[in-house]
Each structure stands twice: as structure tokens, then as C-alpha cells.
Amino acid sequence: MSNKFLGTWKLVSSENFDDYMKALGVGLATRKLGNLAKPTVIISKKGDIITIRTESTFKNTEISFKLGQEFEETTADNRKTKSIVTLQRGSLNQVQRWDGKETTIKRKLVNGKMVAECKMKGVVCTRIYEKV
């Protein structure tokens, strides 16, 4: 994994997030809170363990994993998923599976910013973060 991912990132723009949350099955009240949140994402690495901590006024979440190894995750909207993160062509690609459903979150670096592309049932959401 590129060390360029490591550090603290602040959300600066979000496109189609409400539709993405709807596709995930997130209820209206949680979607409203999610749309208001401007999360900070902290990515760190210790040995071969990567940690992604997301902090917002709505909720804090943290996942720690080894690339290519499945782990259990409880998402910010309380889904219990089996997740796996891989590194492909410089992108951190996360797949979450639960109840026969699947979503992907692809994080890549573009012009010094971290771009997270989230996909579910044909809905694509793009969230852009700047390094703090």
C-alpha cells in the first residue's frame, strides 16, 4: 500500500451519497444525519495491519485489517458485514457483503486528494477528501 494514503483526510465534497445510502437500505433519519456529517478519515499502518478510522459528529467507526483477508465489520449504519480490502493498481478496494447483498468502496489518490467511489446496485457515489 502506498504510504500516500496514510494520514488524516477531511471530506470536502460528496456526490450522490443520499441515493447510495438508499440503495444500502438506510432509513430516512440515518440518511439525514449521514448527509450532514463531514467525516474525517484517519488511515494508519502498523506492520501489515491497516486501520481506517472514520470520525464525525454522527458516529465514529474503525476497521483494522490485513490486505486480502476477510474480516467482520459493523458499519456506521449498523450493517454487520463480511469485508475484504485489496490493493489493485494503487487503489484500496473494499467489498462489503451482508444478507446476500454487496457494495464496493474504491479509494484512490487523484491529484493529492483521496477519492472514494462507492457502488451499490448501479448507484455510484463519489466522496472527495483532502489531506489535513
From Swiss-Prot:
<dbReference type="GO" id="GO:0015908">
    <property type="term" value="P:fatty acid transport"/>
</dbReference>
<keyword id="KW-0622">Neuropathy</keyword>
<dbReference type="InterPro" id="IPR000566">
    <property type="entry name" value="Lipocln_cytosolic_FA-bd_dom"/>
</dbReference>
<keyword id="KW-0225">Disease variant</keyword>
<comment type="function">
    <text>May play a role in lipid transport protein in Schwann cells. May bind cholesterol.</text>
</comment>
<keyword id="KW-0963">Cytoplasm</keyword>
<dbReference type="GO" id="GO:0005504">
    <property type="term" value="F:fatty acid binding"/>
</dbReference>
<keyword id="KW-0523">Neurodegeneration</keyword>
<dbReference type="GO" id="GO:0015485">
    <property type="term" value="F:cholesterol binding"/>
</dbReference>
<dbReference type="InterPro" id="IPR031259">
    <property type="entry name" value="ILBP"/>
</dbReference>
<dbReference type="GO" id="GO:0070062">
    <property type="term" value="C:extracellular exosome"/>
</dbReference>
<keyword id="KW-0813">Transport</keyword>
<keyword id="KW-1015">Disulfide bond</keyword>
<dbReference type="GO" id="GO:0005634">
    <property type="term" value="C:nucleus"/>
</dbReference>
<comment type="subunit">
    <text>Monomer.</text>
</comment>
<keyword id="KW-0007">Acetylation</keyword>
<dbReference type="InterPro" id="IPR000463">
    <property type="entry name" value="Fatty_acid-bd"/>
</dbReference>
<dbReference type="GO" id="GO:0043209">
    <property type="term" value="C:myelin sheath"/>
</dbReference>
<dbReference type="GO" id="GO:0005829">
    <property type="term" value="C:cytosol"/>
</dbReference>
<dbReference type="InterPro" id="IPR012674">
    <property type="entry name" value="Calycin"/>
</dbReference>
<feature type="modified residue" description="N-acetylserine">
    <location>
        <position position="2"/>
    </location>
</feature>
<dbReference type="InterPro" id="IPR031256">
    <property type="entry name" value="Myelin_P2"/>
</dbReference>
<feature type="disulfide bond">
    <location>
        <begin position="118"/>
        <end position="125"/>
    </location>
</feature>
<feature type="binding site">
    <location>
        <begin position="127"/>
        <end position="129"/>
    </location>
    <ligand>
        <name>(9Z)-octadecenoate</name>
    </ligand>
</feature>
<keyword id="KW-0446">Lipid-binding</keyword>
<comment type="similarity">
    <text>Belongs to the calycin superfamily. Fatty-acid binding protein (FABP) family.</text>
</comment>
<protein>
    <recommendedName>
        <fullName>Myelin P2 protein</fullName>
    </recommendedName>
</protein>
<feature type="binding site">
    <location>
        <position position="107"/>
    </location>
    <ligand>
        <name>hexadecanoate</name>
    </ligand>
</feature>
<keyword id="KW-0144">Charcot-Marie-Tooth disease</keyword>
<dbReference type="GO" id="GO:0061024">
    <property type="term" value="P:membrane organization"/>
</dbReference>
<feature type="binding site">
    <location>
        <position position="107"/>
    </location>
    <ligand>
        <name>(9Z)-octadecenoate</name>
    </ligand>
</feature>
<dbReference type="Pfam" id="PF00061">
    <property type="entry name" value="Lipocalin"/>
</dbReference>
<feature type="binding site">
    <location>
        <begin position="127"/>
        <end position="129"/>
    </location>
    <ligand>
        <name>hexadecanoate</name>
    </ligand>
</feature>
